[in-house]
Amino acid sequence: MKNINPTQTAAWQALQKHFDEMKDVTIADLFAKDGDRFSKFSATFNDQMLVDYSKNRITEETLAKLQDLAKECDLAGAIKSMFSGEKINRTENRAVLHVALRNRSNTPILVDGKDVMPEVNAVLEKMKTFSEAIISGEWKGYTGKAITDVVNIGIGGSDLGPYMVTEALRPYKNHLNMHFVSNVDGTHISEVLKKVNPETTLFLVASKTFTTQETMTNAHSARDWFLKAAGDEKHVAKHFAALSTNAKAVGEFGIDTANMFEFWDWVGGRYSLWSAIGLSIVLSIGFDNFVELLSGAHAMDKHFSTTPAEKNLPVLLALIGIWYNNFFGAETEAILPYDQYMHRFAAYFQQGNMESNGKYVDRNGNVVDYQTGPIIWGEPGTNGQHAFYQLIHQGTKMVPCDFIAPAITHNPLSDHHQKLLSNFFAQTEALAFGKSREVVEQEYRDQGKDPATLDYVVPFKVFEGNRPTNSILLREITPFSLGALIALYEHKIFTQGVILNIFTFDQWGVELGKQLANRILPELKDDKEISSHDSSTNGLINRYKAWRG
């Protein structure tokens, strides 16, 4: 991968000039000038997904200049580097190969000259065998009863991805009850343990090193709770499995290493749901549906790695994001799924994007003088409409939005879905085109009211519009289409990281807080006053000690 400061490229300079021409052009102007705009600025993927990016403040010239930027930053070379197993995560000297985990073509992918696919397939086969034994009831707990509940204990990528996917694919789930514990706050594990029976519960401990503080604290509490009922430590092996690479620590915990599912250092945490970390997904929806999830992602991988930039969906979405973030000064992006099963999708890509591209140092080790990753947030529609859409419509911040919805619902109850989708379509239209003062006044006239007598309220009913959106319409949310959608966003994030010259696949920003927490923890063991920190931290610790009693 080349390390190119994007602001020093000819394309960036051209974009800056182009922005001066575009900054006052409205989306309404663009549609008025081109009645065929939708067909030019939308694309369908695999007859499963329609991406409409026509309601953006862009022209064909904008996209051409953004694609020039991608070329100058050697995006094509970076894509080849990732897919070929080059160690593009240079700060940790690791390859980045989540694409290998879903490589359904089985073409060899090499790391240090060794094809990783045989190992990937071996772990998948092991996950299949294990999950089938649990789901069928063949696997028995220590009292001879079948498993009814699965508790996934992990944090970050070991929790967010599996939780998001099992929720999104709830229509495909079997009889097993799924629970997820992540927070080191004892409330989280306590509340889950109240719901389950030690005789019929399987715990999955998801930690690559088997040393993650939050995960291992929760795992030991789960083990203690289990042994209060089971008594004999030998029973742990029937009720705990590990998603890890530390066989020694797994064995010491009491887990049979035959039930340890490994993954590799070329699997980043926030890209790990495709690996053994996805065992909870397999247990929830079955192995065949998990393979469909992998297949959908693989189809998007092929699209991303082989399609020219001008038709490449992850690249187009990435470039449009850079346009807003760096030229219009938009600091955030909202992800708004109009599907209640997708209620964790925005949270998942909040981590996916912000932990990947929330960096202020470039690949050369220099502090950047441009914007890198945006703030990602969002909630399902229509809930968000009654919460924060006010600011998106009439606030002073530009918030580019991705609206996501399925054409076919899993719950065809009365006319619910038509009402939901009418809101989905209406919101992007309202954001793009707004409502002028003239229209507001005419509405008053149509009601038999004199606008002049209502002058005081008219300005508050005006919508400027010109708020940009993408619309992603899925035929239906299935394991395949969800896999493709997740991969679409993953590759968008990668593309932005390449162009913005940052390392997308490390996360050093999480380390300092952990180091300081490890230093502070021993100081909380007694009641002595602390004076070893700044006055604020000392004051907080000392008040905590006084209040806890």
From Swiss-Prot:
Function summary: Catalyzes the reversible isomerization of glucose-6-phosphate to fructose-6-phosphate.
Modified residues annotated as N6-acetyllysine in this record: K80, K228, K234
Pathway annotation from the record: Carbohydrate biosynthesis; gluconeogenesis; Carbohydrate degradation; glycolysis; D-glyceraldehyde 3-phosphate and glycerone phosphate from D-glucose: step 2/4
E.C. number(s) listed in UniProt: 5.3.1.9
PROSITE patterns, A to Z: P_GLUCOSE_ISOMERASE_1 (PS00765), P_GLUCOSE_ISOMERASE_2 (PS00174), P_GLUCOSE_ISOMERASE_3 (PS51463)
Enzyme class: isomerase
MF terms (GO), sorted A to Z: carbohydrate derivative binding; glucose-6-phosphate isomerase activity; monosaccharide binding
GO cellular component, one term: cytosol
GO biological process, one term: glycolytic process
Keyword line: Acetylation, Cytoplasm, Gluconeogenesis, Glycolysis, Isomerase
InterPro entries assigned to the protein according to its UniProt record, in alphabetical order: G6P_Isomerase, G6P_Isomerase_C, Phosphoglucose_isomerase_CS, SIS_dom_sf, SIS_PGI_1, SIS_PGI_2
Active site: E355, H386, K514
Family: Belongs to the GPI family.
Protein name in UniProt: Glucose-6-phosphate isomerase
Gene encoding the protein: pgi
Subcellular location: Cytoplasm
HAMAP family: G6P_isomerase (MF_00473)
Highest taxon of source: Bacteria
Stored PANTHER family: GLUCOSE-6-PHOSPHATE ISOMERASE
Catalysed transformations (reactions): alpha-D-glucose 6-phosphate = beta-D-fructose 6-phosphate
A family per Pfam: PGI
